[in-house]
Each structure stands twice: as C-alpha cells, then as structure tokens.
Design a protein with these regions (language model features):
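Substrate-binding/charge-relay-adjacent region of secreted/lumenal peptidase catalytic domains
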Residues: 2-99, 108, 113-389, 412-417, ...
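Phosphate/diphosphate-binding glycine-rich loops and adjacent basic-rich segments that engage nucleotide
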Residues: 401-406, 410
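Extracellular low-complexity, O-glycosylation-prone Ser/Thr/Pro/Gly-rich "stalks"
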Residues: 395, 494-553
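A generic structural signal for beta-strand entry/edge sites
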Residues: 104-106
Length: 553
C-alpha cells in the first residue's frame, strides 16, 4: 500500500499499466508541467456481461437476443456512486470533470500535467522514436484505496501512436488487378443495392479524405455518391494530406524521388490519407446501400478507445459493423489497454455489432526483435473478426484462386499477419480447429479468422489524390468483410454480430461458405487445409455463406 508524498492518503496501484518501451526509444525530458492534458478513466460495470459463447456463440443470427444500447447502459454501465467517488478524487487533485459518461463507463479528467502526475503518482516524460514523438508515463499509476476495483484503466497518460505503417521505398508502378465490381462478383456480393438500411463505421487514426476523390471514384463506377460523413474525435478531424504531400509520396513509390528527401511527417500524412480513402471507397462500393460513418481519432490508445466507445454508445442508428484497419503487436501495449478495448468489443458483440480488424501487413514476425512471431491487437481479441490477406492469382467470374499474401511491398516484404496470441486464450469455437501453441508454449487465440485480397499486385482500383492506385494490405480486407456483414444483415433481416463462432461452426460442417486457401506462408506459418495462421478459414463466398446461415438451425 503506497502513500502520497504530500499526505497520508492510502493508495493502491492500478494493475497492468506498465509502459512497454520500444526498441530505440529515447527520453528527451520531462513533460511541461503546465501542459493541459486529458485522461480517460474506465470504470467497472454495474453488472458483468454474460459469457458470450454461451449467450450468443452457437446461435443462428435470428435466434440471438442482443441488448439495446439502453439496456446495456442501464445494466452494465457505470454506477452513480462510483462516479461520485471519482468526482471527489478529481476535485481533491484540482482536476476538471471534462466529461462524465456512465453509459460508456468512463470519466474524462483534464488539468495540468503536474496535477495529473500528482493525482496518479507517476512521472510524465517526452519520448522520441522512429514512430514519432510522444508522451510516456513512468511508474505504476496509483489511486486512493476507495477507488480500488472501481477504476480499471487510465488512458491518455501514454500517447504513443497505435498504428505503425511501413516506410515506402522505390518500386515499379503497381497497376490494379481488378475493379470493385469485378472483385464483388468474385466474392459473391449481390448485384443489387447491397447493405441497404445498414450502417458501417470506419475507425481511422488520423489522415482524411477528399470528397472530390470519392465523387470521381463513384462516378467512374457509374454509381451515385453514397451517404458518407466524418465524425471528429478528441480534436482530430478530416485532414487529408495536401496535394504536394501526396505528390511527394507517389514520387517515392514510383522512383522519382529518394525516401530520404521526404520528411517523415509528409509520408505519414500521405499514407494515412491513402488508408482512409481506401477504407471508404471499398466499404461504400461493396455495400452501396449502407451509410458510411468515418470516425477520425488521434493515433493513440485513448483516441481509438474513445472513437469505438462513442460509436457504440451513440444516439444514431447502431452500426452493423465496425472496420478497424490498424493494429500493433499485442506484446507492445499494456494489459490494461488490452482489457479495456477487448471489453468494448464484448459490448459490440452484445449489441450485435461485428468488429472487423486487419491482422497486419508484416507477416508472422511482425517486426519482432527476439525471433519469435507475434500477432497484432486488436485483431487478437477473441471478440473481433480477424482479417488476414491473400494473393489472387486468377479470377474467372466467381472461380477465384488464392494463396497466402507474401510479397515485396514498397521495397519491404509485406505479408499477411497471423499466428497465436500470447495474451488471449483459445476461444471455445477455435478449440477443434488445430490452433498450434503460442510462442510462449501456451494455448492461445489463433489469428486470423478469415481472409481477402491484400496483395497490391493484385489489388483493387481506388482513387487517392486524383490518382488511380491499387488497394493494399489487410487494411483492405477489414472493410471488405464489414461490407459483407452489411449485405448479410440486410438479406437475413437479423444481425450477425458476433460472427466468428458461426463461421467456425460452418467450416466444421464442410459447407462452401468459405474458400479455403491452402498454399503460401507468412514467413513462419504455412497455409494448409482447414484453419491456418495465414488466412484463417479462407475467403468469402457470400452467396453460399448467406444460404448456409439461412438454413442453419
């Protein structure tokens, strides 16, 4: 039991908040004590959620009983007396109550950095790394004993970027392999207005898009402009890279300019813009009847948590799917953060929202320096649909041949992320599918669950900055599956929601709902029959998947 340096207040440490330093990380000095900061406190639930596999897992979508937002907030939101205790704590430490959201189980406190340090018994420092400049908290955060068990996490002390993107290098120009309508036909998407009356939320970390790109893109498809709008989170907004920044980025890709000549912030802005635009164009083109909402949040743990939380708890139409095209190795983040986001994804499952997450683009090793493979989070959450990548070798109508994606990408090797989690145990629905032991010798959650086209040499035509480009990476697969879920929900008249258990059940019964991908590797794991750690259960055959779900008991 600790005590503050200025009094006899008994305190307890918050579990799982260790700072995991990155290789090459360098501290440059203390955070300005007068800097104004905001942190998000995540509180315990009024009542715990039921075990999801029992409540939802094996049931047909039309048999599932999802919670409404109101029921989730009333039964599983924060307690009023817990919020009162946090409010008293904030006043004692001269922190402002910036936002109180019992339905989201969160309280946002703001104040000077020195007050934040004193309130939580930590030291804030500034850090430089190849990923950029950010803030880190040294020491374990503590809270008064009366908040023990009430405050589960404090987000915002650390501002390290969540999404990491590979540096582009010179390569030959990549021409798109096919158009969106061609890809849609290959994977069985309907020719009609798929996804009608559905809502897809895209979670983006920085960057933005140009409306004129979207208008030209859909005009080229001879389609009307879909319903697309952006939502700003925590000060972030739709901020696409400038035309000059995009020009420098494409000059690097096409060998007209050296990488060393382009500032890192220019590359980051251009890559983020390409990512956001790609997500929108693919999701909206594959499910043209759906409303697309783009949440643009800061590239931090706090930013991503707040974006997902606000969409799930909002007052507008509940989304059928969330698409998250980012990730970082689960071994590089705190356990408190893992548990916090995983808890949000459990909320999504109970609400009937499918969360599609890209598995990563750096293969099984995923930038590891210890020689051991590692998987990305939140793709490793058992409550996410983890989306891996394939290379399409041929497509004649709906006859598609694929292998696990593993190629040279922008001068670097790009490959589908996949492996076995070191943080999450094997979920019940994966136990009979041959998931190997994790690198630490334990049973873990296998990644990915499914796959889709990720190889830029066989990518889909998109439009960014007025330029025709090829879709790239597992970031392109998450919006594809989100669009697929929108089409399924429309046709079934019910929410698929927590869809992974359904897909594994279908795979076990040998249906044609998924196309197995049995060739290729991701640098450590080999593709093969059944589930594999490169492409999961395989790529979709939407029409067969819909038929299987309609007749499932």
């Amino acid at each position: 039991m600790a005590r503050t340096a200025t009094g006899n207040e008994k305190r307890t440490a918050l579990a799982g908040h260790h700072h995991v330093p990155l290789h090459g990380e360098k501290q440059t000095g203390p955070t300005d004590p007068n800097a104004e900061l905001a942190v998000t406190l995540l509180l315990r639930r009024r009542h715990e959620l039921p075990e999801l596999h029992t409540a939802l897992g094996g049931k047909h979508p039309q048999q599932r009983r999802h919670l409404s937002r109101e029921a989730l907030a009333q039964k599983h939101g924060a307690r009023s007396d817990d919020i009162a205790r946090v409010s008293r704590f904030a006043r004692r430490h001269k922190l402002d109550l910036h936002e109180i959201a019992p339905h989201r189980r969160s309280v946002v406190l703001s104040g000077k950095a020195s007050a934040i340090e004193h309130a939580f018994g930590i030291r804030l420092v500034e850090v430089e790394h190849a990923r950029g400049k950010y803030r880190a908290a040294l020491g374990k955060p503590t809270v008064p004993v009366e908040l023990a068990g009430i405050v589960h996490a404090v987000l915002g002390l650390n501002t390290r970027p969540c999404a990491k993107r590979p540096k582009p290098h010179r390569q030959h120009a990549v021409e798109p392999f096919w158009t969106v309508p061609e890809m849609a036909r290959a994977y069985g998407f309907p020719d009609t207005l798929g996804g009608a009356k559905q809502r897809i939320a895209l979670i983006e970390l920085g960057g933005g898009y140009y409306k004129q790109d979207l208008q030209k893109f859909f005009s080229s498809l001879q389609r009307p402009m879909p319903s697309i709008r952006s939502v700003a989170v925590d000060g972030a907004r739709n901020s696409p890279a400038s035309p000059d920044q995009l020009q420098q980025f494409f000059d690097v890709l096409h060998g007209r300019r050296k990488l060393s000549e382009v500032p890192a912030d220019v590359l980051a802005a251009a890559q983020a813009t390409m990512e956001v635009t790609m997500d929108i164009e693919l999701a909206a083109a594959l499910a043209p009847g759906a409303d697309i909402v783009v949440y643009i949040a800061p590239n931090t743990e706090q930013g991503i948590y707040n974006a997902v939380s606000r969409e799930l708890s909002g007052k507008e139409k509940l989304p059928c799917a969330l698409s998250i095209s980012w990730g970082e190795p689960e071994t590089e983040v705190s356990r408190a953060y893992l548990k916090s986001v995983d808890s949000l994804l459990r909320d999504a499952a109970m609400l009937g929202v499918t969360v599609c997450v890209s598995s990563g683009d750096e293969g099984a090793m995923n930038g590891a320096t210890d020689g051991k493979p590692r998987v990305n989070f939140p793709a490793s959450s058992p409550h996410a649909l983890s989306c891996g990548g394939s290379t399409v070798h041929a497509s004649r109508g709906r006859d598609v041949r694929e292998s696990a994606w593993n190629c040279v990408l922008y001068g670097m090797r790009g490959a589908t992320g996949g492996g076995v989690s070191r943080r999450f145990p094997t979920p019940p629905w994966q136990k009979k599918h041959g998931v190997p032991l994790s690198p630490n010798g334990r049973k873990g959650r296998g990644v990915p669950d499914v796959a889709g086209p990720a190889d830029p040499r066989r990518g889909c035509a998109i439009l960014v900055g007025g330029r025709r480009c090829s879709s790239v990476g597992t970031s392109a697969v998450a919006p594809l599956w989100a669009a697929l879920v929108a089409c399924l929900n429309q046709e079934l008249g019910a929410r698929c929601g927590y869809i992974a258990p359904l897909l594994y059940n279908l795979a076990a019964s040998d249906t044609n709902a998924l196309r197995q991908i049995t060739k290729g590797n991701n640098g450590f794991y080999q593709a093969g029959p059944g589930w594999n750690a490169c492409t999961g259960l395989g790529s979709p055959r939407l029409e067969h998947l819909l038929e299987a779900l309609r007749v499932a008991p």
